[in-house]
């Protein structure tokens, strides 16, 4: 679990996301509260439940990006799902409990990586010995003199191995045979049975090994992974992963507005109100059965987000609204925001384009007025057509640099992208509403 303070979390998010300070502060406080809760005595800890969040804002302003970056910072089991993927129990589609099953799988993978990292040094030593056994097979019935000589030869080879002098040498080693891959098409709601059958089939022949030729460098990596897997306990990993999911798990549900009842629409809302009602016990706290054991969802943090351009947060069923007490509104982007998005974030869009074309020897320079014109064009097109937020910048940059990208590689050159260049390449398209609707 990350022990970063809210200010540090916001500072990290600022490196990648422009503006939206309210949303950043809300998720930073929620993440820090997870850490604070873990410092409490056990009896008090069980009483403190997370305050779930609803992020509201137009598309392309940073809701999903905040979730992506938060996942990297959290150092806790984190899963992002779209609400539109799920349907009411009994209908074709995934039921909402599969969110928790997927979260458990993520936690086990995370815990296994941590456990294997902890035994990496011992695994490397064991892998080294196995490679030396292949390079210098131990002789039978050797005298004391011969065994001393063999030991000194082994040390010479060990030194060469550690220095990388034997990396390209090809050897034949015994590696664990790949498990049998079985794909089972199961009806909705039967994922549990499917996973159990897949586990049963994959365990067949797990103990078998096969001889494989590979370089010492590849063999060392493979043997190290094998040895690390022997040193860690799968049972402990599962137990700790389930505990981590219950105490620190975070679920991000995107497109929550798409399952809200829209105004005066009548008819069966299979994938709407039913999904909301199925989400209620999950968010409130219930016990979900997974193939690894039972998981209580009482202390899992749920962050939901939606554009709400065809519906309103009040269109969600009242019970669900009550379980999302923290509301954060994200602001629509201005030309100044677009300008900052092009230059400020780590690995910004302009830096990415410069780096890509530099591989072909093309040097691109964006001037300040060029960046301003790109930002203004993106804002204008968003205002006159569909507002897709910062995603519009991708479309405009690709269109602007289309000719440069096509001719790159034929000759090395330096291109200066200023206001005049942007107007020459995008001016007519941006002004013509019919064309910009389809091309930009």
From Swiss-Prot:
Superkingdom, natural source: Bacteria
Residues binding ATP: 18, 60-65, 254, 319, 391
GO CC field: HslUV protease complex
Alphabetized GO MF terms: ATP binding; ATP hydrolysis activity; peptidase activity; proteasome-activating activity
Keywords: ATP-binding, Chaperone, Cytoplasm, Nucleotide-binding, Stress response
Subcellular location per the Swiss-Prot or TrEMBL entry: Cytoplasm
Main localization, broad class: cytoplasm
Gene Ontology annotations of biological process type: protein unfolding; proteolysis involved in protein catabolic process
HAMAP family linked: HslU
Subunit record text: A double ring-shaped homohexamer of HslV is capped on each side by a ring-shaped HslU homohexamer. The assembly of the HslU/HslV complex is dependent on binding of ATP.
The family this protein is said to belong to: Belongs to the ClpX chaperone family. HslU subfamily.
Biological role: ATPase subunit of a proteasome-like degradation complex; this subunit has chaperone activity. The binding of ATP and its subsequent hydrolysis by HslU are essential for unfolding of protein substrates subsequently hydrolyzed by HslV. HslU recognizes the N-terminal part of its protein substrates and unfolds these before they are guided to HslV for hydrolysis.
Identification of the protein by name: ATP-dependent protease ATPase subunit HslU
High-level lineage: Bacteria, Pseudomonadati, Pseudomonadota, Gammaproteobacteria, Cellvibrionales
Gene coding for it: hslU
């Amino acid at each position: 679990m990350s022990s970063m303070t809210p200010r540090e979390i916001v500072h990290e998010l600022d490196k990648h996301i422009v503006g939206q300070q309210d949303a950043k502060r809300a998720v930073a406080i929620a993440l820090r509260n997870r850490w604070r809760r873990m410092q409490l005595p056990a009896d008090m800890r069980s009483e403190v439940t997370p305050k779930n969040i609803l992020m509201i804002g137009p598309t392309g302003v940073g809701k999903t990006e905040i979730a992506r970056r938060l996942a990297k910072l959290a150092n806790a089991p984190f899963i992002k799902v779209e609400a539109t993927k799920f349907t009411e129990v009994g209908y074709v589609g995934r039921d909402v409990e599969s969110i928790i099953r997927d979260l458990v799988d993520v936690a086990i993978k995370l815990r296994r990586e941590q456990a294997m990292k902890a035994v990496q040094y011992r695994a490397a030593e064991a892998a080294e010995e196995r490679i030396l056994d292949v390079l210098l097979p131990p002789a039978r019935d050797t005298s004391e003199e011969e065994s001393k000589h063999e030991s000194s030869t082994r040390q010479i080879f060990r030194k060469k191995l550690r220095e990388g002098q034997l990396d390209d040498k090809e050897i034949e080693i015994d590696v664990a045979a790949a498990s049998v891959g079985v794909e089972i098409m199961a009806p909705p709601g039967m994922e549990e049975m499917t996973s159990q059958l897949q586990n049963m089939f994959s365990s067949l022949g797990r103990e078998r090994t096969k001889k494989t030729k590979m370089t010492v460098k590849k063999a060392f990596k493979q043997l190290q992974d094998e040895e690390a897997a022997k040193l860690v306990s799968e049972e402990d990993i599962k137990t700790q992963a389930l505990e981590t999911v219950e105490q620190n798990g975070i679920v991000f549900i995107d497109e929550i507005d798409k399952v809200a009842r829209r105004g005066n629409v009548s008819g069966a809302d299979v994938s709407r109100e039913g999904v909301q009602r199925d989400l209620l016990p999950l968010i409130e706290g219930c016990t979900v059965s997974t193939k690894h054991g039972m998981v209580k969802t009482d202390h899992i943090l749920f962050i939901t987000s939606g554009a709400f351009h065809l519906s309103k947060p009040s269109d969600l069923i009242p019970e669900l609204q009550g379980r999302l007490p923290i509301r954060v509104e994200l602001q629509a982007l201005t030309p100044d925001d677009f300008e900052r998005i092009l230059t400020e974030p780590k690995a910004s869009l302009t830096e990415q384009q410069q780096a890509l074309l530099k591989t072909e020897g093309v040097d691109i320079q964006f001037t300040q007025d060029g960046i301003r014109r790109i930002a203004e064009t993106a804002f204008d097109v968003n205002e006159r057509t569909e507002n897709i937020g910062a995603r519009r910048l991708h479309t405009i940059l690709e269109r602007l640099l289309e000719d440069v990208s096509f001719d790159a590689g034929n000759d090395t050159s330096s291109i200066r992208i200023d206001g005049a260049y942007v107007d020459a390449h995008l001016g007519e398209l941006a002004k013509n509403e019919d064309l910009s609707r389809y091309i930009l």
